[in-house]
Structures are given as C-alpha cells and as structure tokens.
C-alpha cells in the first residue's frame, strides 16, 4: 500500500482503529462507552439521539448505521461529530479493545458467551466497569448484576426487577424500525444527571 510506505518513510505514527478511537474517547471531558455482547449499536444510537435531541451536541461513534441520523448526505450514518465534549462510543469486547477505554460512564447491556470464554469476558467487563466513574448496568442479566461489586457508583435498569434504579414498563413498539414508547419509573434517590 503506497500510503503506508509513504507514512513509514516520513516517520508518521500508525494507529489501528481501536487505538485511535480509544485515544480520542479517553481524551473527551465526558465519555460514555456502551458495551455488552449484544445491543451495543442500538443502545449507542439511542443515547446519541437522545443527547442530540436535547441539545447536547455529542460526538458519536457506532458500529452500525444509526437510523435516526441517516440523511441524503449521510446514508451510512455510523458517526456524528459534535462540539460539546461529550463522546459516546460503542466499545467492543470481541478483540479485547474494551481494555483500552476509560469511560466516565460505562454502560453494560449484557454479558454472554460470544467471541471469548466467559472467564475472559468477565475479566474484561469487570475491569471496564471498575475504571468508570459511573456504571449503568442491566439487572435483567445475571452477568451484569455480578459487575455491581466492582463499580464505584452504579445506576441500574430493568424491564422486570423492581429494585432497579430505572424500571421500564408498558414498553410498546410503534413501528418496526425506530419508535419505542415506554413508561419509566425512577426509584427515589436516583438523580436525573
């Protein structure tokens, strides 16, 4: 590849995608990393959309097209460049690059057998959660419940566990692709930060 040869010739640094992305993410004043063995892209897109719709102007890096951001100019909208200092990114465990991230907020949807052994996955997610200022954890998945022990501060969510900080109920899908309506109950003492 001519570009790599030219870069070597001038001594330019060469970074892989995970290295570059984690460096940018870790430098952000507020970083929200979305992890889990499934649902990362959808959750990243939802968080990005909520932040954008509420005027927060986030930067978002996703592993899939974010339907709400698709336009004629951006048909493959898997990223969004904002100007607020908030960086939302899908964080991947399959290649171990999750270990490179130090999030302000670590969201973990679920942990299940995928790409690595359960022991490896538990260690990766445990270390990821331990580095975050706040962990957002799904109480409907036993493996994410186990991550509570290592979290500095945790906010929990659930579709069925009434002890969760945030409990979604009466979930209704309106269309096949991108409209979901739910009622959310917040437990007393959980601030809306």
PLM ranges: what are they?
Residues 1-153, 183-191:
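Phosphate-binding loop of NTP-binding sites
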Residues 65-66, 161-163:
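Active-site loops of AMP-binding adenylate-forming
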Residues 125, 158-160:
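A cyclin-like helical interaction fold
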Residues 162, 174-176:
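Ser/Thr- and Asn-enriched, surface-exposed coil loops between beta-strands
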Residues 171:
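A conserved short coil-to-beta-strand element within the FAD-binding core of flavoproteins
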Residues 178-181:
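Short aromatic-glycine-enriched beta-strand elements
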């Amino acid at each position: 590849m001519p570009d790599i040869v030219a870069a070597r010739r001038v001594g330019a640094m060469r970074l892989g995608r995970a290295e570059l992305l984690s460096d940018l993410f870790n430098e952000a004043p507020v970083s929200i990393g979305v992890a889990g063995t499934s649902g990362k892209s959808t959750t990243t897109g939802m968080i990005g959309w909520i932040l954008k719709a509420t005027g927060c102007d986030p930067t978002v890096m996703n592993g899939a097209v974010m339907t709400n951001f698709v336009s004629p100019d951006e048909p493959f909208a898997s990223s969004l460049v904002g100007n607020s200092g908030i960086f939302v990114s899908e964080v991947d465990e399959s290649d171990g690059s999750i270990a490179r991230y130090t999030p302000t907020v670590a969201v973990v949807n679920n942990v299940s057998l995928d790409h690595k052994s359960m022991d490896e996955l538990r260690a990766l997610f445990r270390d990821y959660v331990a580095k975050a200022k706040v962990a957002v954890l799904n109480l409907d998945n036993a493996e994410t419940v186990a991550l509570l022990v290592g979290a500095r501060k945790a906010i929990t969510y659930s579709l069925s566990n009434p002890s969760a900080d945030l409990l979604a109920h009466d979930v209704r899908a309106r269309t096949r692709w991108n409209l979901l309506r739910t009622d959310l109950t917040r437990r007393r003492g959980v601030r809306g930060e």
